[in-house]
Amino acid sequence: MAAEHDSDSVEPPGSEALLDAVLRTLYDLGETEGETEQKRIRKKKAKKRDSETIEDVAVEPLPLPGSPVRGQKKSASSFFQKLREELQSAPAAPSEVPVTTAVSLSPPKNGSKLVEVVEFQSKSKKRKLKSDEDEPAKNKTKVVKKDVDIQEFNLEKARLEVHRFGITGYGKGKERVLERERAIMLGAKPPKNTYVNYKVLQKQIKEKKIAVEEEKRAARETDIFKKKKKKGRGQEDRRSKKSAPSILSSGQVGQVGKFRNGTLILSPTDIKKINSSRVAK
């Protein structure tokens, strides 16, 4: 008993506060009067000591349950070890759990901290990928549209050049009128109509009608004159054909009938002449 009392007296002064803190975390013992201020101080001290003990455990591996402990800290470390054995009385081995904690809490060798690598994919990259995929289709449509526009522009330009070249064949007065019509066709505003008095307008209409009628009469007269000429020529041709004796049917040569396309054609008069000549003989 005396040895046990001596070992308790050797314990460090902060062991009682640590024991109280551990017991209060495990069991709800309730609060007494005047403990509020002391409790705060004890909690701060307990947190500092717990952090120190955890760092010691992380740096130095925990000893096995049968191994001896260093000098003065023998009683406190043995007490904590017993508590852990009681709390962690599970089917798993008790020595394996602290080793894992030690490994997890052990800092890296060169004093460098472990850094988590996070890959961040921004929306702009996704949009760029989609735009890169859509670019060839857009380029194709643009090329097709450009080709169509070029063809249409060339056709319009050619049409205007042909129209301009056709105007040059007329006189200056008509050329100006045609140029004005071309400008109106391209979208220019036509000139305003000139206002004329009603009586003057009636005279102009009558003059136009008279001019049209005269042109029609002249055309008719020319047509009649041409027809008369054609008729006279036709009658003269017929008379010349009848009056001109055929070389083959002339009595001087002694040939009867006419040749057409290599065949001899005899008229009924020719046949009668032949028959009468035979009877006379």
From Swiss-Prot:
Official protein name in the record: 40S small subunit processome assembly factor 1
Keyword rRNA-binding: no
Record-level GO cellular component terms: chromosome; nucleolus; small-subunit processome
Source organism (scientific name): Mus musculus
Subcellular compartments: Chromosome; Nucleus, Nucleolus
Single biological process term from Gene Ontology: ribosomal small subunit biogenesis
InterPro entries: FSAF1-like (IPR027973), SSU_Processome_Comp (IPR052852)
Gene transcribed to yield this protein: Fsaf1
Task performed by this protein: Part of the small subunit (SSU) processome, first precursor of the small eukaryotic ribosomal subunit. During the assembly of the SSU processome in the nucleolus, many ribosome biogenesis factors, an RNA chaperone and ribosomal proteins associate with the nascent pre-rRNA and work in concert to generate RNA folding, modifications, rearrangements and cleavage as well as targeted degradation of pre-ribosomal RNA by the RNA exosome. Prevents helicase DHX37 to be recruited before post-A1 state.
